[in-house]
Amino acid sequence: MTDCSRCAGTNASGPNYWSERIRDIVDFPKPGIVFKDITPLLSDGPDFASALDEMAQPWRTTPLDAVLGIEALGFILGAALARELRTGFVPVRKPGKLPGRTLIREYALEYGTDRIEMHEGALPRGARVLIVDDVLATGGTLRAALGLAAQLELEIVGAAVLVELLALQGRQKWADDVPLLATLSF
């Protein structure tokens, strides 16, 4: 057994405390970007559990058929939330990562475009889904996932992110009629 006071959790909890656990990585993934690294928060069991509980709380009484988790850290949060909410999990992946027939959605980045995909028929039409990602920045990835869910005729009950970067105004580009909840804001 190792001595790791950081690993033991603390009595401190809540958004202010969790914000301190998220570190800034300057010039990642490219110069001029300040990346919000959530992995220190995820690496502490009690902190991860309490942050996840906070993310799940608004959706506990919402009937859901599945959580759609966006690659990559949205997989971790999405799968954990699906378990917490006792519902299914469906991955939303980068192109070429899912076997079989998929639907693909292209979206704009600051410089260029990217794409995400989901399995065709992953869920029946009308299935009620919650879209989950780690960070809301410009909103492109979340909007693309929303578009895929709409193409599959799923009922989108909301979206949840751990971190929202307010300066990038991704929320302003979100669908007004679909709730979007962020646990932490910077």
UniProtKB/Swiss-Prot annotation:
Phylogenetic classification of the source organism: Bacteria, Pseudomonadati, Pseudomonadota, Gammaproteobacteria, Lysobacterales
Report what the protein is called. Adenine phosphoribosyltransferase
- What are the alphabetically sorted keywords of the record? Cytoplasm, Glycosyltransferase, Purine salvage, Transferase
* Alphabetical list of InterPro entries matching this protein: Ade_phspho_trans, PRibTrfase_dom, PRTase-like, UPRTase/APRTase
What is the source species? Xanthomonas oryzae pv. oryzae (strain PXO99A)
Q: What does this protein do?
A: Catalyzes a salvage reaction resulting in the formation of AMP, that is energically less costly than de novo synthesis.
Please give the family membership noted in the entry.
Belongs to the purine/pyrimidine phosphoribosyltransferase family.
The record ties this protein, via SUPFAM superfamilies, to: PRTase-like
Q: EC number(s) per UniProt?
A: 2.4.2.7
Query: Where in or outside the cell?
Result: Cytoplasm
- Tell me a Gene Ontology molecular-function term this record carries: AMP binding
Q: How the protein assembles, per its UniProt entry? A: Homodimer.
Q: Name one Pfam family in it.
A: Pribosyltran
- What does UniProt give as GO cellular component? cytoplasm
Metabolic or biological pathway, per its Swiss-Prot or TrEMBL entry: Purine metabolism; AMP biosynthesis via salvage pathway; AMP from adenine: step 1/1
Q: What class of enzyme is it?
A: transferase
Q: Which reaction does it catalyse?
A: AMP + diphosphate = 5-phospho-alpha-D-ribose 1-diphosphate + adenine
GO terms under biological process: adenine salvage; AMP salvage; purine ribonucleoside salvage
